[in-house]
Amino acid sequence: MPVEALAQKAKEKDKEKATELEQIVVTAAGFEQNVKEAPASITVITGEDLQKRSFRDLTDALRDAQGVAVTGVANERDIFIRGLPGSYTLILVDGKRQSTRDARTNGNSGFEQSFIPPAAAIERIEIVRGPMSSLYGSDAMGGVINVITRKVADTWTGSVTTDGTVQQHKRFGNAGQLSFYTSGPILEDTLGMQIWGRGLKRGEDKFLSGITGSREHDLTARLAYTPNEDHDFFLEGGTARLRRDANVGNTIALGPRAVSTYNDNDRDHWSFSHTGRWGPTTSDFSMLQEWAERRNYNYSQADGRFIKQPRAPEVRNTVIDGKFTTPFELGGSHTLMTGGQYFEARLSDQNPGRRTGRNETFSATQSALFAEDEWRMADSFALTTGLRLDHHEEYGYHLSPRIYGVWDATDMLTVKGGISTGFRAPDIRSIAPGYAYTTGGGSCTYGPTGTCGVIIADPSLKAESSTSYEIGAIWDNGDVILGGTYFYTDFKDKITNMPVVDAAGNPVRWSEDPNYRLWYNYNIDDAVIQGVELTATWNATADLTFRASYTYTQSAQKTGDFAGFPLARTPEHMANLRADWYTPVEGLEAWASVNYHGEEIGAGPRIPTNGKPVTINGKLGRKYDAYTTVDIGTKYDVGEGLTLNAAVYNLFDKEVEQTDFNAVGEGRRFWMSLTATF
């Protein structure tokens, strides 16, 4: 290899190493900080890392991250952070929330993580583990995932990527994806544009309860206007279309009542934002509107076509955010952030339990004020304190304080820890007066002795809340980085729904329609979640890096019908080991990873019969087996702007089937991508 090429290769590796040690994040405090100094437990995944792997949605991006579990049944895999389900994690794109789960009833998991940009448009993903409600309000109870996109380029640039996955076993569906990203100036130094989009198609699995077929399309455009050095304006609009197909004889069992079906899950959004610099103070303002709808279609043998079903839930969210960030000196250096938020959610849907067939409109409005200050008392110690006051039109006021300290004990050792609070507002269907939510599954029966039920909304429900304590340390000598965190979360007032029974244990019928069993929402469950997160990075040589992480999560419900069981089906143990190697061949990199997903325990009134039975305090739950998978891959810079990536996932073809795991894991599969950059 020529000397010049070797020198360039060394520079690139040194740059990547420096970037790893000095990553800048914004999610933990609302302004830019070094990741080690951030007042939270935070992981960063770079856009470059995403482009080396098969990346279709956030679950692909986060499967290696410490403290994060991707779990669930085949079509509802969701992101769990520190033992809390996906609905307790706030997903942001450039700091703007995505909250369209209410548009998808009776199974809303597995979709929200798809409404994100392609890998080429992403600069990094920041994952904050633990409550962040003092800054972000409701839904940030388990943590925050913030997808940060790339800045508008000074010169026109872009890329097109095509990738595909071929399954070794024909019972799994193959997949193909095409994505693009482009950015550049319209008026030099004044007006710029970004456009990105993608199309994805995955075949339906050919076995019962497998992964449904999918077709996904999205397109987003953004204008950036900078009239002078003190002001930036951004205008963005985007659309996404997700379709899921399930056919009789493939993922739906054969039977006299079985019908093939598909659903469309649409999301449109637009946003306007402004950043202003007013001397030492910086202001950030944004307004976001998002609209989402689900439509279901069933195949009619009589008509020979798919017929749209009458129910089509639609949600429209409006979010207005504003904040000011001001540095000042008073007994040390301060960075004070103050701001507020207005959030209105409007749901248009049938009231299914009342069987009127008419759409009704339900709404909920929240507003908030918050303040947070980072006080650097000394060069080696910073204390962050924050307080947020939220007001919800139904349940009233809620305070979310936090305090967090970061101490640079030595040049290599940083100790950090604090107390954070979180809360989650009840969803609209749980508190809308008069709403009756049907339950019981597609095979339930409606009648005087039927098994179908209705869950009655209760406007008096309280917000779920948590208090989390954590202490951790990071040791970094340049070649080796070690990190460890212990966390403890006290979870209160979990909202659950249970059937109402009489003294003899028989189901109570709903007085307004005795053909339904009666269910109610309750604030009854308290739980404790605790765990340990360990991580290590070793730059063994200039060409070889090892990364490892381990997460232990233990949770137990303290009250309710399932006391003693975990709060959610999260693996007790997770571990990951990854190696990255710059080979002696110019432009060629290789990687390998091992992922361990430990045993899970699930319990609840609707628990399926998969897995092994387990009894705690006289109640029956299910245990799901652990499994380990191995992946290998490579990246090759062909030259002339072309990059080739390839990987073998689940190298040893580990079977993860519904019967034992209550989940479906694809077998050995082969992935390849080709990116053209211009």
Locate the predicted segments by residue.
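N-terminal Sec signal peptide and the immediately downstream disordered periplasmic leader
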Residues: 1-53, 61-63, 183-184, 225-229
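N-terminal periplasmic accessory domains that precede
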Residues: 58-61, 77-80, 91-94, 111-115, ...
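Extracytoplasmic beta-strand/coil segments of soluble accessory domains associated
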Residues: 59-100, 123
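Short acidic/polar hinge/loop motifs at secondary-structure boundaries
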Residues: 97-129, 221
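Periplasmic-side early beta-strands and strand-to-turn transitions of outer-membrane beta-barrels
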Residues: 153-265
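Gram-negative outer-membrane beta-barrel transporters
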Residues: 161, 324, 376-380, 487-490, ...
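Membrane-embedded beta-barrel scaffold of Gram-negative outer-membrane proteins
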Residues: 162, 282-298, 408, 416, ...
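Face-selective signature of the C-terminal outer-membrane beta-barrel domain
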Residues: 224-242, 262-397, 406-410, 483-484, ...
